[in-house]
């Protein structure tokens, strides 16, 4: 809302704002507030698809802003200190309170049941309820239940998210009790709020019912899994209770739904009435505006009549004047002549205006009107304005004499003005007035940009500036239109410029005629128009940017707009000082009269405010940040001004001039309005003007009088100065005075800032001391802060403005004079501030690094975070207050979290919000900080950041918007980007910032959501810590006491609450993680495509928040750990990790942060990621994960081996329910202890590594906040990211048992990631390993752990070395490199993100790792290290020729080291396959990675890539190397995993063909990883490492360039037109075709190359060839090199894959094996998709999916079947055959089946199925899936290889390549995920492939025979499945198909986003498809599918065999699987 929820504000306001406002006053308890926020975020995550993404954003914003703003809500937040108060606050009606109590009790029960922290599920129901009531005061979980209840009462829709937050079971229980109660409450609330509608919406209730039923199914499945796994009865009981509760909830929901349906008729009418009222109000407003316009028009007409009269008089005077040439000053004759001349001038002016008007449309008319009005007004003003109508002629004559007397002065002034205007137009600040005007204008322009959103007045400001006479309303409308339509605005500006030119001519002419009136009129008009036109032209973008930057500043912008209007008036006075002083006085009087003094007040205030704003912008950036809380309102305007100014600082002179002109124009507009009002009706004019003034008055009622005086004084002084000065000297003096005044104001502001800082410090101290007071302060400060995050930012400016306003009032002339000095001062201050910020950030980074180096200097890292986020000043204060605030922050940043759970509950809402922001800021400021697992520090930091960071965060967000603080830059290079953005404000940056600000709006929304989620997470962490402390107190022992105490209902209650906390934490952190991913994606997209408004929603704030949010959840866990440690958990480091729940959560938070962030992210993307996010969001999925954890308890048992993982994982599992179950009961203590002990060790190692990683990832962190988060967990970036990715993939994509499995795996992998933390260098591989770990760790945790330790230690050494160098280089040189490549990287990242929306964390991790590898040397080192490790591990794991393959791939990579671009391509393939394999493990993430890889390799195909092919290439290298690392690591991991599970997997690998299978195994570590590790080794050895002859490439490129250069030389003098560039592109393409051998992918390649060339050459359009010829040639050569290298690489891969095919065919029966392999690959994908315990589904999936997939796969993969054996070969085959075939099928089948909307639709179903199918037996399905996955892997890998080759070698446009890569992902990269990929990922074939997985998922239960029959209907069925898959695929295909991540990818990124992309972008068009694509007919495909189904049966047999043979028998697996893969 205030914080950029503007676009979302509508929905939010409708549903949430009223709820919030009413609930704040009446219904919203603090707990409820927070709960509502949480629930809203969660609900939005769940229902992101359902507009709840927006609503949740709004809710988050509302929670943050309205909740914070009302202060009541915050105070209520305090009341929860006595939690019963909050629960029973008067807000709630007695029945509602009773229901809330019941609901809370039930929630507590459900939490206890689900999380089984309290062992007694019944006890939880009874004792837990009682105790909860008792402990609710101190237990945030009670608070959360309260929140849930409150949310439910507020919004029924909030309930599902809350349930998710609490845990699927808890949520269900909460829903059961809370739905009935809350729905009733909602009804009541709706009655109370008048907004029952959002809470009462039947659709929401229905969705809840569906969710509850999903929960029931998932809970039942979890229970079944637990029963299968012999889970503890407590967990089963809890699940049973949960199911009962869910059923009760279902009943209650049904009842409530019935009630609602009964009430709906009433509600709907009420809603309709409300809507009608709104419409009526809007219509009234419109009518009023129209009336105002009419009145203005009437006034204009009256003025025109007066003008005509005056013109007639003037015409006479003009004639005399002309005759006299202004020589005669006497009498009426001169006056008459002047009047006549004036009439002529006016007529000409009007004619010119009218001529120019038509194009401008409304604005032009208004401009014309305003011009005429300006003349009329100026004329009428020159006569006494009040007496103008009756005495106009007399006054005109008298004034004409005066004017004639001053005519010479005017002529001089006009000449000066013209020269100055020309100079100003030339960006010269020669005219101080214009510079002043420009300053004010720029601020107003920003304000106008915001104003259209905020008020019509801001528009009126802008419009009034260009169209002074237009009524404010009309101007507002016109300005809104203008702002909305910059093109129109540009036209209008052009017209205005034309008019200004005409006016100038007229002015010159009338200067000759010496008509002072005309001069004054023209001058005024020119001033207004020129200023406005310049302002508009230059600030049209900035205005929307301002909106983006300061979306929260809407209200502030109204103020600013009013300021700008007033300033414009005052400036116009200044500008019109050219006119006589009498005129000035008259004008001021007229303005005062017309505005009833408000305009003058506004002007005065605005002027001062504007000057102050400028000053404040310079000085108050930080002050505003610090004062933001206290000074939310004016600060926003200041921040907006600052944003505009900041943007303008590079062009400060211009901007100053433009601001001055705008201000002058606005002043003139005000004056004209005043005059018009006076002429027609003072009242009417006052009505209009006072409307604007009243807005100002509303904002600054107290300052109006003073401001009026100051405005009058200033205006008069300025006019006097201008009149007296008449020269630039006067203006210089004016500027000097203004600068002096501004300096004084700056001093004042600095003093104020110091005072505010002191106050803030005191407040912080008070907050630490008194959380309650902190809450009140938060309610006072945070409420406005959250309400107006920008406003808060600007609030300090308000105070400063007040002080400076008084000064400026006293020093009006000085202020006017001060303008130049002020601007220079402001610039200096801005630069100083930016430098300070840079230094601050550097300090923070250094602090964070130092703290990280301290490792587990947990306190230090939060401090570093706060340093980074807060800034240098805040650094010190926050550090001091952090320790003090730690309790407060975790206590809700208001209360000591450890002290009172009730307090936590009380403060939770506000504290969470604050903590959210704090954490976000923490994370933002020190995303590295989050690396340290120091909850106490994080808590302190959070509390500290709660306010300051909030402010700074918000300020940073606006600042990022204002100063182009790119969220991506922030996330990736927070220090550097922040510095860079702050200090460097180039025009390009400004435009980029404007674009960014759109992103920033989105990002800010995401950041808000992240903050919200983070605050929730922090609150939950506080609750968790409090509960942990309580548990500690109760148990007095870390775990030994727990088992005995667990029986105690209190302990159960506490543990239940802890479980709830953890569940909610996991969900919230998943949300945070997803939101961070979203933010990272948005930021990358923003960086890549700053044009994308969505991506930039809150680019700056989002960029940091994504990292902070990601880090926040991790910080939360870290902090909770510290809190646990603080309460004495530090004493029990084992207990701290175990109870750590926070470290576990950090790791889990990786997952859950992802999930948590997903809901927010879903909300934030609103539409984009909502589907994908929904999957991630699926909080039930975490619960599912818990059940899957139960399924993976064996893995958990293995966890003790990986106890570090286990320590974190146990909590994750505890949250998820698997470890949770043991934790809850004796197992809880045991596993926690084990986890704790190992967690301790791992934490120590991890902390040590984290230090390293923090240092290493600091660099990457700055660029990639996500890495920081993983460091927090373990390797916050890697571990958490990988785990988050895995959790996202598993929870979202494998919402079914896979989700569970993946959660446990992810937990393990997080732990492993902790191990791998040191190996962050191979973080890209590590994500794969993490994912592999997620699946394979659970299955092979020990081996994976061992291997990961091995590899990661080695990699860690390499990475540490590299990163140690990279830390310095990345922070410095790498940052600069990254900065240089930022846009390219961002575009590439955006492409990757867009393709991998479902698994942004993997992308983040990958990019982070790539960033860490900031040099090609480091990248290659990492690649080689990974390759060596992988090949060594593969050789160890597999003593076969596979090692040679691995080595060969290493050698190939090494050989590629020479060929950086080609290596990039080759490595991109490998990395793509690595990623794809990773994705196969996490099919979604892998698919996204494959997409990423394809995007990376084909980066130039996408516009972002095309933008910078070189940078893209470099990034490709990075990503390729990262992928190679991931692939190698995954291979190693797969091999290690294969040691444990290799038997099955390797068998599958044997079938699945080595390299692809290896990748698949890595990806599907549990199943395929082993196979791939075994087979891939031989296959890798078999893979002829694709090598690119760089010399040959260079020769080829030179041959091409030889032809191109002469052509370019011929046109060297020409401008690069599209035709010329097209001809160049065609020439290059033709030459390339001549030089390239024709191959099947040549067509693809050429199409891609053409696309890339077109994109890359497009940036040269409009430039002269001679200026950009060199760059153009370099660009062409780079593109050619990259694409040709890629093409050749793909050719090599294709040839290799063909050879591999042949080898595989030898190994496997030729045709049948191929088809069976395709089917098996499908099965493997599907089965692997279902390995999470979907064996049954897997079999069905195998049948169905394979039927579909076999059709698809056999069709798509016929050619590349052999490719399966070798990754390269597979790739080649995939490209050559599989890819084309895959594309064809995916095109034919996918288009029909294309998940155009599948991503979102599938998300819902998938989410549901994630819950439902999540419980499916993970290992069994994994085994079964392993077979299917192997075959599918082979197929998919083959497809991917071929596809990739086809796409890459053919340089298929990124779209196609993405499609092909999706296919690759589906086929080669994700054998295990092949089905899932085919289900979801195949973008080209993804649609149909996705549908087969859907078919598989839906049909998974069906046996293979079904698949065969389905194979025949596969194409149609795939289409059916596509649609079905969109919904069920996520659930059915997702769970059976493979680790539901594929589903997530499918519907989220791959199918929903990526699949849609593939449909829209990635779909390889028929003409693009290689000829091979059509090779197979449906019959052939069906035959192949049948064969594959047979093969699938073989895979089933293999699966049976796999357990034994998986370890080392890759050949055995190879033959069937490899044949399948290769043959496919």
Curated annotation (Swiss-Prot):
Protein location: Cytoplasm, Cytoskeleton; Cytoplasm, Cytoskeleton, Microtubule organizing center, Centrosome; Cytoplasmic granule; Cytoplasm, Cytoskeleton, Microtubule organizing center, Centrosome, Centriolar satellite
Stretches assigned to coiled coil: 218-301, 400-424, 487-543, 651-682, 726-769, 824-858, 1063-1089, 1515-1539
Phosphoserine: modified positions: 65, 68-69, 93, 110, 116, 119, 159, 370, 372, 384, 588, 643, 861, 866, 869, 872, 960, 977, 988, 991, 1185, 1188, 1229, 1231, 1257, 1260, 1262-1263, 1318, 1320, 1573, 1697, 1730, 1765, 1768, 1776, 1782, 1958, 1977
Biased composition (Acidic residues): 618-632, 1768-1777, 1799-1815
Tissue expression summary: Expressed in blood, bone marrow, breast, lymph node, ovary and thyroid.
Pfam families: PCM1_C
Region (Interaction with BBS4) residue spans: 1913-2024
Biased amino acid composition, Basic and acidic residues: 43-61, 1089-1099, 1192-1201, 1835-1860
Low complexity biased stretches: 634-643, 1905-1916
Pathology noted in the entry: A chromosomal aberration involving PCM1 is found in papillary thyroid carcinomas (PTCs). Translocation t(8;10)(p21.3;q11.2) with RET links the protein kinase domain of RET to the major portion of PCM1.
Family the entry assigns: Belongs to the PCM1 family.
Subunit organization: Self-associates. Interacts with C2CD3. Interacts with BBS4, BBS8, CETN3, HAP1, NDE1, NDEL1, MAP1LC3B, GABARAPAL2, and GABARAP. Interacts with CEP131; the interaction increases in response to ultraviolet light (UV) radiation. Associates with microtubule; association to microtubule is reduced in response to cellular stress, such as ultraviolet light (UV) radiation or heat shock, in a process that requires p38 MAP kinase signaling. Interacts with CFAP263. Interacts with SSX2IP. Interacts with CCDC13. Interacts with CEP290. Interacts with PARD6A.
Protein's UniProt name: Pericentriolar material 1 protein
Organism: Homo sapiens
């Amino acid at each position: 809302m205030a914080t950029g929820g503007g676009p979302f504000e509508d929905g939010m306001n409708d549903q949430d704002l009223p709820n919030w406002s009413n609930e704040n006053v009446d219904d919203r308890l603090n707990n409820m507030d927070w709960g509502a926020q949480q629930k809203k975020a969660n609900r939005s995550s769940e229902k992101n698809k359902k507009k709840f993404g927006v609503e949740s954003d709004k809710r988050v914003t509302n929670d943050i802003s309205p909740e914070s703003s009302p202060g009541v809500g915050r105070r209520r937040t305090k009341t929860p200190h006595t939690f019963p108060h909050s629960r029973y606050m008067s807000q709630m009606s007695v029945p509602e309170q009773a229901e809330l109590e019941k609901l809370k009790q039930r929630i507590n029960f459900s939490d206890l049941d689900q999380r089984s922290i309290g062992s007694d599920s019944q006890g939880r129901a009874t004792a837990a309820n009682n105790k909860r009531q008792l402990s609710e005061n101190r237990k945030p979980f009670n608070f959360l239940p309260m929140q849930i209840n409150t949310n439910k009462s507020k919004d029924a829709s909030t309930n599902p998210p809350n349930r998710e937050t609490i845990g699927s079971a808890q949520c269900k229980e909460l829903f059961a009790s809370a739905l009935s109660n809350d729905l009733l409450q909602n009804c009541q609330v709706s009655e109370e709020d008048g907004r029952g509608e959002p809470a009462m919406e039947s659709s929401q209730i229905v969705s809840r019912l569906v969710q509850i039923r999903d929960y029931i199914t998932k809970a039942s499945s979890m229970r079944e899994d637990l029963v299968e796994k012999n889970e503890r009865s407590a967990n089963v009981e809890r699940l049973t209770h949960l199911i009962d509760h869910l059923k009760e909830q279902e009943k209650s929901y049904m009842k409530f739904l019935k009630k609602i349906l009964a009430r709906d008729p009433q509600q709907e009418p009420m809603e309709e009435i409300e809507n009608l009222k709104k419409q009526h109000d809007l219509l009234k407003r419109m009518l009023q505006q129209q009336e105002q316009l009419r009145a203005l028009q009437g006034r204009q007409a009256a003025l025109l009549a007066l003008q005509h009269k005056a013109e007639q008089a003037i015409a006479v005077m003009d004639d005399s004047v002309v005759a006299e040439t202004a020589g005669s000053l006497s009498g009426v004759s001169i006056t008459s002549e002047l009047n006549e001349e004036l009439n002529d001038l006016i007529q000409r002016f009007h004619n010119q205006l009218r001529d120019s008007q038509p194009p401008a449309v409304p604005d032009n008319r208004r401009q014309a009107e305003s011009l005429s009005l300006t003349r009329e007004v100026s004329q009428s003003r020159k006569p006494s304005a009040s007496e103008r109508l009756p005495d106009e002629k007399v006054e005109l004559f008298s004034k004409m004499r005066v004017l004639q007397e001053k005519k010479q002065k005017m002529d001089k002034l006009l000449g000066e003005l013209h020269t100055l205007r020309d100079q100003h137009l030339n960006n010269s600040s020669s005219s101080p007035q214009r510079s002043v005007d420009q300053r004010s204008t720029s601020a107003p322009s920003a304000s106008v940009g915001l104003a259209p959103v905020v008020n019509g007045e801001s528009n009126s400001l802008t419009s009034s500036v260009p169209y002074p006479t237009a009524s404010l309303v009309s101007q507002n409308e016109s300005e809104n239109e203008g702002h909305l339509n910059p093109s129109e605005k540009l036209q209008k500006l052009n017209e205005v410029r034309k008019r200004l030119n005409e006016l100038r001519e007229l002015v010159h002419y009338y200067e000759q005629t010496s008509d002072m009136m005309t001069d004054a009129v023209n001058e005024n008009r020119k001033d207004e128009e020129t200023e406005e036109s310049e302002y508009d032209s230059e600030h049209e973008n900035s205005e929307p940017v301002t909106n983006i930057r300061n979306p929260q500043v809407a209200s502030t912008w109204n103020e600013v707009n009013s300021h700008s209007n007033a300033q414009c008036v005052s400036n116009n006075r200044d500008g019109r000082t050219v006119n006589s002083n009498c005129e000035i006085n008259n004008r001021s009087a007229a303005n005062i009269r017309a505005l009833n003094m408000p305009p003058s007040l506004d002007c005065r205030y605005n002027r001062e405010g504007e000057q102050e704003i400028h000053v404040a912008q310079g000085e108050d950036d930080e002050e505003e940040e610090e004062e933001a809380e206290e000074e939310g309102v004016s600060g926003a305007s200041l921040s907006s001004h600052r944003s505009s100014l900041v943007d303008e600082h590079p062009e400060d002179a211009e901007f100053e001039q433009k601001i001055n002109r705008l201000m002058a124009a606005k002043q003139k507009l005000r004056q004209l309005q005043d005059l018009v009002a006076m002429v027609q009706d003072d009242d009417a004019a006052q009505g209009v003007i006072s409307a604007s003034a009243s807005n100002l008055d509303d904002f600054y009622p107290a300052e109006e009088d003073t401001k009026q005086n100051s405005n009058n004084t200033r205006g008069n002084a300025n006019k006097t100065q201008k009149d007296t000065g008449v020269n630039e000297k006067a203006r210089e003096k004016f500027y000097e005075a203004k600068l002096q005044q501004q300096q004084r104001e700056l001093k004042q502001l600095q003093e104020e800032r110091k005072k505010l800082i002191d106050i803030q410090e005191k407040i912080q101290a008070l907050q630490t001391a008194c959380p309650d007071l902190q809450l009140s302060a938060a309610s006072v400060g945070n409420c406005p802060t959250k309400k107006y995050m920008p406003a808060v930012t600007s609030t300090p400016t308000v105070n400063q403005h007040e002080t400076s306003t008084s000064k400026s009032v006293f020093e009006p002339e000085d202020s006017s004079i001060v303008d130049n000095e002020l601007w220079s001062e402001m610039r200096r201050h801005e630069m100083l501030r930016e430098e300070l910020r840079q230094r601050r950030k550097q300090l923070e980074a250094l602090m964070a690094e130092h703290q990280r180096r301290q490792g587990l200097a947990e306190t230090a890292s939060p401090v570093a975070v706060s340093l980074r986020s807060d800034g240098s000043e805040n650094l010190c204060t926050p550090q001091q207050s952090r320790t003090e605030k730690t309790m407060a922050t975790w206590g809700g940043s208001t209360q000591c979290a450890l002290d009172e759970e009730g307090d936590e509950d009380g403060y939770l809402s506000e504290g969470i919000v604050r903590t959210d922001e704090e954490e976000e800021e923490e994370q933002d400021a020190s995303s590295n900080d989050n690396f340290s697992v120091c909850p106490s520090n994080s808590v302190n930091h959070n509390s500290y950041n709660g306010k300051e960071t909030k402010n700074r965060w918000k300020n940073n967000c606006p600042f990022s918007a204002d100063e182009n603080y790119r969220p991506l830059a922030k996330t990736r290079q927070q220090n550097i980007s922040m510095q860079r953005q702050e200090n460097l404000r180039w025009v390009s940056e400004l435009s980029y910032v404007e674009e960014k600000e759109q992103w920033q709006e989105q990002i800010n929304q995401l950041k808000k959501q992240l903050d919200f989620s983070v605050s929730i997470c922090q609150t939950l962490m506080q609750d968790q810590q409090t509960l942990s402390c309580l548990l500690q107190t109760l148990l007095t022992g870390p775990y030994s006491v727990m088992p005995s105490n667990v029986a105690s209902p209190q302990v159960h209650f506490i543990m239940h609450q802890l479980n709830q906390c953890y569940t909610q934490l996991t969900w919230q952190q998943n949300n945070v993680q997803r939101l961070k991913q979203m933010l990272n994606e948005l930021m990358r997209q923003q960086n890549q495509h700053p044009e994308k408004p969505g991506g930039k929603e809150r680019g700056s704030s989002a960029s940091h928040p994504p990292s902070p949010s990601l880090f926040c959840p991790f910080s939360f866990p870290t902090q909770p750990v510290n809190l646990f440690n603080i309460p004495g958990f530090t004493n029990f480091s084992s207990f701290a990790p175990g109870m750590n729940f926070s470290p576990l959560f950090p790791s889990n938070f990786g997952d859950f942060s992802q999930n948590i962030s997903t809901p927010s992210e879903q909300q934030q993307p609103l539409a984009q990621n909502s589907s994908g996010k929904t999957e991630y969001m699926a909080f039930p999925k975490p619960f599912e994960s818990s059940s899957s954890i139960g399924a993976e308890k064996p893995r958990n048992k293995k966890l003790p081996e990986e106890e570090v993982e286990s320590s974190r994982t146990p909590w994750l599992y505890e949250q998820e329910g698997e470890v949770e179950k043991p934790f809850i009961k004796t197992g809880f203590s045991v596993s926690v202890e084990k986890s704790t002990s190992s967690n301790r060790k791992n934490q120590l190692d991890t902390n040590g590594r984290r230090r390293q990683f923090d240092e290493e990832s600091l660099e990457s962190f700055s660029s990639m906040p996500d890495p920081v988060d993983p460091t927090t967990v373990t390797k916050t970036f890697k571990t958490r990211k990988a785990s988050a990715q895995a959790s996202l993939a598993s929870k979202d994509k494998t919402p079914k048992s896979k989700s569970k499995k993946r959660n446990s795996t992810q937990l393990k992998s997080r732990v492993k990631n902790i191990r791998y933390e040191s190996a962050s260098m191979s973080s890209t591989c590590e994500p794969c390993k993490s994912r592999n770990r997620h699946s394979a760790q659970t299955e092979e945790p020990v081996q994976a752990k061992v291997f990961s330790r091995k590899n990661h230690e080695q990699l860690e050494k390499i990475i540490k070395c590299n990163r140690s160098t990279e830390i310095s280089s990345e922070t410095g040189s790498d940052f600069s490199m990254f900065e240089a490549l930022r846009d390219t990287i961002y575009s590439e990242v955006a492409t990757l993100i867009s393709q991998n929306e479902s698994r942004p964390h993997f992308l983040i991790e990958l990019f982070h790792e790539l960033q860490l590898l900031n040099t090609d040397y480091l990248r290659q080192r990492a690649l080689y290290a990974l390759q060596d490790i992988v090949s060594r591990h593969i050789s160890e794991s597999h003593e076969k020729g596979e090692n040679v393959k691995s080595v060969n791939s290493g050698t190939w990579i090494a050989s590629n080291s020479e060929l950086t671009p080609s290596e990039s391509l080759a490595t991109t393939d490998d990395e793509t396959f690595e990623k794809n394999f990773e994705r196969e493990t996490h099919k979604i993430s892998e698919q996204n990675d494959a997409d990423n890889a394809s995007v990376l390799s084909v980066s130039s195909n996408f516009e972002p890539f095309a933008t910078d092919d070189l940078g893209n290439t470099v990034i490709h290298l990075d990503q390729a190397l990262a992928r190679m690392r991931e692939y190698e690591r995954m291979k190693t991991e797969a091999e290690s995993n294969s040691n444990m599970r290799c038997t099955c997997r390797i068998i599958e690998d044997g079938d699945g063909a080595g390299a692809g299978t290896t990748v698949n195994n890595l990806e599907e570590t549990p199943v395929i990883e082993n196979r791939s590790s075994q087979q891939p080794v031989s296959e890798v050895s078999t893979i002829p490492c694709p090598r690119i002859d760089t010399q040959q490439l260079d020769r080829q490129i030179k041959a091409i360039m030889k032809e191109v250069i002469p052509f370019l030389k011929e046109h060297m003098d020409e401008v690069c037109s599209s035709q010329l560039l097209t001809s160049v592109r065609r020439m290059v393409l033709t030459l390339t075709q001549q030089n390239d051998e024709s191959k099947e992918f040549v067509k693809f390649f050429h199409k891609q190359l053409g696309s890339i060339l077109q994109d890359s050459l497009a940036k040269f359009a409009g430039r002269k060839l001679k200026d950009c010829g060199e760059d153009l040639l370099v660009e062409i050569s780079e593109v050619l090199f990259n694409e040709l290298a890629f093409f050749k690489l793909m050719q090599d891969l294709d040839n290799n894959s063909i050879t591999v095919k042949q080898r595989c065919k030898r190994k496997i029966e030729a045709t049948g094996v191929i088809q069976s392999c395709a089917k098996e690959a499908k099965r493997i994908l599907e089965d692997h998709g279902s390995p999470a315990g979907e064996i049954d589904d897997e079999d069905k999936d195998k049948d169905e999916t394979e039927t579909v997939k076999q059709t698809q796969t056999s069709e798509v993969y016929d050619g590349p079947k052999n490719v399966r054996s070798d990754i390269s070969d597979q790739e080649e085959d995939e490209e050559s055959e599989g890819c084309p075939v895959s594309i064809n099928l995916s095109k034919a089948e996918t288009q029909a089946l294309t998940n155009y909307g599948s991503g979102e639709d599938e998300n819902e179903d998938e989410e549901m199925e994630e819950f439902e199918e999540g419980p499916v037996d993970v290992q069994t399905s994994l085994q079964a899936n392993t077979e299917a996955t192997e075959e599918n892997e082979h197929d998919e890998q083959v497809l991917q290889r071929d596809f990739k080759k086809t796409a890459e070698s053919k340089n298929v446009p990124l779209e196609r390549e993405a499609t092909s890569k999706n296919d690759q992902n589906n086929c080669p990269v994700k054998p295990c995920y092949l089905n899932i990929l085919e289900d979801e990922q195949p973008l080209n074939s993804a649609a149909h492939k996705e549908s087969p997985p859907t078919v598989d998922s839906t049909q998974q239960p069906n046996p293979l025979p079904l698949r065969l029959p389905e194979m025949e209907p596969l194409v149609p069925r795939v289409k059916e499945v596509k649609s079905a898959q969109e919904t069920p695929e996520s659930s059915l295909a997702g769970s059976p198909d493979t680790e539901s991540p594929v589903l997530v990818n499918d519907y989220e990124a791959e199918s929903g986003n990526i699949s849609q992309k593939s449909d829209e972008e990635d779909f390889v068009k028929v003409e693009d498809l290689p000829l091979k694509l059509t090779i197979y007919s449906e019959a052939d495909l069906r035959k192949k599918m049948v064969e594959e189904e047979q093969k699938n049966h073989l895979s089933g047999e293999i699966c049976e065999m796999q357990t034994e043979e998986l370890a080392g028998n890759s050949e055995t697996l190879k033959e069937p699987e490899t044949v399948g893969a290769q043959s496919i």
